[in-house]
Amino acid sequence: SKAQPGEPSSAIRDRVIKARQRQEERFKDIPGIYCNAQMTERMIHQYAEPDETGINLLRMAMERLNLSARAYNRILKVARTIADLEGCENVQSNHLAEAISYRNLDRSDWAERGL
């Protein structure tokens, strides 16, 4: 099969701008909070709470990867951002799976291998 060209950087830029606008709108009434990365734990539960399938996926990842409560919150923040980039109102299982995969890469031994 023929390789598909990647998404043009102009399209990526547009998605990022729209995601940032969603975040600014979400937090417009909360002083000092402008983006998902700044969410408190309470805000994470309000704005990034996954459905039951997502919660089960996250629990399984927490156990298998031995992740901390802090890592749990970081995964939810990243998943919320992925959902924003896709224009989704709610965090879905696929957003969590992607966020978990980034966390798993973060924990891998890439540095040991010099990669």
Q: Model segments located where?
A:
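Acidic, low-complexity intrinsically disordered tails
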Residues: 110-114
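Basic, amphipathic alpha-helical bundle interface domains used for macromolecular binding and assembly
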Residues: 1-109
